[in-house]
Each structure stands twice: as C-alpha cells, then as structure tokens.
Amino acid sequence: MCGRFASSTDPAELVRLFGVQQWDPTETLAPSWNVAPTAKTFAVLDRTPRGQRHPVRQLRVLRWGLVPAWASSADTAVKMINARAETVHEKPAYRQPYASRRCLI
C-alpha cells in the first residue's frame, strides 16, 4: 500500500473473514476504489476494552494515517501513511506503534 488503495469489501464479509467479535453495523462507508491518506476506512484490530483482561477483535472505522507520538495535536499533525517493512521496527515514528498498536486496513 503506497499512497492509495481500494476498499470495496462489505463489512459483514470482513467480520466473517477475520473473526471479528465486536462491530457496530451502523458504521458504514461507501465502497471506494481511490481511498486517499486521511480518509476514513475500515480497520480490523485487537484491543483490550477498559475493565477487561483479554483483547477483542474489532472492526472499526478509522482515519488512515499515523499521528506521530511527538505531535502536539492529532488535528494539526502530519499523518504518516507509509513505512518500509525492513525498517518499521527501527524508525522512531513507527517503533512503538508497530510493537503494540497494529491493525489491518
């Protein structure tokens, strides 16, 4: 995924394919064959809800882009969208998110 991608799979199909346990069916997005950085898109992620001990696989609508830890505000930060697989675990902007906050776009 470089600068754009296509997103046309029905969310119910994503739930089935990836074993999603938590999903709000009212969160919908129109199919797009030109999803740009900072656009909303579906993401599959494992997160531990507050007060629980184990992660839950979720399908959520998120904005595509990583806000760096040093940004003072998510609204004004330049969102990063691309990392090299060979160095993602080394680069300061990606190291911590790569270790603990990954998701499938």
Question: What residues fall within each predicted segment?
Answer:
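Short linear sequence motif anchored by a di-proline
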Residues: 1-104
